[in-house]
Amino acid sequence: MLRIPGKSLGYHEDISLTPWQAILASVIVLLGLKVATILYTAFYNVFLHPLRRFPGPVTWIAAPWMKSISHIRGQQDHQIVKLHQKLGHIIRVGPDTLSFTEMSAWRDIYGTGHAELPKHIYKGSGMEERPNIITAHSRDHHRFRKAMTPALTPEAITHEEALIKGYVDMLIEHLHKFAKSSDPYVNVSQWYTMTTFDIFGDLCYGESFNSLATGKQHLWLKSMSSMKVLVPLLVFPYISWLLVWWLLSPEQQRSLSDHQKRSYELTMKRIANRDTHPRHDFMTFMLRNRGEDQGVTDHELASNSDIVISAGSETTSTALTGITFFLCSNPDAMARCAKEVREAFKSDDEITFKATAELPFMLACIEETLRMYPPVPTSLIRRTLPGRPTLIAGELIPENTIVGVHHLATYRSERNFFDAKAFRPERWLAETRNDPKSPFKDDRLDAVRPFSYGPRNCIGRNLAYHEMRLILAKLLWHFDLKLKPGYEDWGFKQRTFQLWEKPKLVVEFKERQFQV
C-alpha cells in the first residue's frame, strides 16, 4: 500500500493507493506530461520557431509525423509541388526544414562558394553506418570520389563503349523478336532496367548479371523494389527496424538481407581475381589504393559498388522509360526526333557515343524529359552550419536548418519555365533560346540539375548521358513506337519514394519500314 500525504494535495487525510493504483496514476501522469510536451512543441513550432516567417502546411510543421506518413504513402513530393505553386519559391515543409525552387539556391546550398553544408542523415536510421559516396561526410566523400573518378573519365568511358554497345545490341535483338511476334507489346521499364543493370554489373564486377541473356530479372532487381519501399521508413529515428519488420513482407525482408550478402560476395570475388582480370573496369581503378590511408577498405568497396550499380542502373533506366513515355505521348516530337536520327545514320554501325552527341533535337528531348520526370524527384537535403546564419536565395537561414532544392517542384514551376507542365523539347534548342520572340526565352534552363550540383554532383553523369543517347538513337533507328492503350497517364500518377515507383510501361514495337 502506497501512502501519499493528504495535506500536500489539500486533503485532511492521507491517501492510500494499492500498487496497481499507484502504477496507473504514474502512467496517467506520464501520459499527461507527454501530451503537454507534444502540445507545447507544436505551439512552439508554429508560433515561436525561428522559421515561423516562412509559409508551409501547419499540419507538417506542428506534427512532423504527418509528413512522414505522406512520404510512406508516396505522396510527399507531389504535395510539395502543389505547396510551392501555392506559397512561393521558399516554403517550410517541417519544423526545421525549408524547400526551395529558386535557381540561385543550387549554388547557395550545394556550391563551393562557402564551407560545405553537410548532408543531413537521419540519426538512428542506420544510414550513417553505411560508408558510401552518397552518405559519406566530406572527407570520406572526397576519398571515394578520388578512387572512382579515373573510371569515369572521357577516356575510360570511350574504352568501355564496345562493351556497352554489346548490351544495347542485345536489347535491340530482343525487341526485334517482340516486334515480329503476334504480341509486339513490351514492358520497356523492365527491359531498360535489365539492360542498364547488366551494363553496370559488368563495368563494376567484370561479369554480367545475364538479365538480357536469360530474359529474366536478376534477384538484385527484386531487392531494389524492396529498397524503394524501405527508404521512407528511415526517417523514423531508432524505430526504422521495427517499421521494416511490421510493414515489409518476410519475402521483402529476406530479399534485402540477401542483397547485402550478394553484394559483398561479388566484391570479394572481384578482389580475389584482381591480378587475372582481363580488362579495366570500375573495380580496377578503385582497387589501386585499396587498404592505404587514401584508399578504400573492402567493406567500403562493397558498399560503393552496391551504390554504383543500384543508383546508376535505376536512374538511367528511369530516364529512358520517361523519354519513351513522353515521346510516345507527343507524336510531333516523336516524328521529329525519329527523322533526325534516321537521317543522321545510314546504318546501325554508325550509331556511336560521339555521333549521338550531335543530334540537337534528340538531346533536347532527353533534357526535357529530365525536367518533366527527373530520376530523383525529391530534395537532396543539407543542414546549415551551426553558429551562424546562411544566405540562401536571398534569405538569411538560421543555423541547423535542413534545406534542399526540390527537383520536381523546381522543374515544374511556372516561375522558372513557360508552360512548365507541358513536354516542350524545343525550349532547349539554341535557336529558341536566341529568339527574342520565343515564349521560352526567359526559361531558367540552369535551374534543371537532375545530376545535382557542386562537389557532390553525380559522378556518373557523362556515362548516363552516353547510355541514354545510344539506346534512344538505336531504338528510334530500328523501330516505330506507340503506347499501348491504357498507359496515357503513366507519367502523372506515380508515387515517389526518393525515386519514382516506376510501374510498367507497355509500348508497341513495330519494325521500321526502310525506303527502297
Swiss-Prot record:
Q: Which UniProt keywords apply?
A: Glycoprotein, Heme, Iron, Membrane, Metal-binding, Monooxygenase, Oxidoreductase, Transmembrane, Transmembrane helix
Per the UniProt record, which residue ranges are transmembrane? 23-43, 229-249
Glycan attachment sites: 187
Q: Where mainly located?
A: membrane
Q: Give the way it sits in the membrane.
A: Multi-pass membrane protein
- Superkingdom field: Eukaryota
Localization annotation: Membrane
**UniProt organism field:** Metarhizium robertsii (strain ARSEF 23 / ATCC MYA-3075)
Question: One Pfam match, by short name?
Answer: p450
| GO cellular component terms, A-Z | membrane
Q: Name one GO molecular function term.
A: oxidoreductase activity, acting on paired donors, with incorporation or reduction of molecular oxygen
Query: What phenotype is described for loss of this gene?
Result: Leads to the accumulation of intermediary metabolites destruxin B, destruxin B2 and desmethyl-B.
What family does the database annotate?
A: Belongs to the cytochrome P450 family.
Query: So which cofactors does this thing need?
Result: heme
Instruction: Tell me what this protein is called.
Output: Cytochrome P450 monooxygenase dtxS2
**Gene3D superfamilies linked:** Cytochrome P450
Binding sites annotated in the UniProt record for heme: 458
InterPro entries recorded for this chain?
Cyt_P450, Cyt_P450_CS, Cyt_P450_E_grp-I, Cyt_P450_sf, Cytochrome_P450_monoxygenase
What this chain does, per the entry, is described as: Cytochrome P450 monooxygenase; part of the gene cluster that mediates the biosynthesis of destruxins, insecticidal cyclic hexadepsipeptides which induce flaccid paralysis and visceral muscle contraction in insects through targeting the calcium channels and vacuolar-type ATPases. The aldo-keto reductase dtxS3 converts alpha-ketoisocaproic acid from deaminated leucine into alpha-hydroxyisocaproic acid (HIC), which is the first substrate for destruxin assembly by dtxS1.
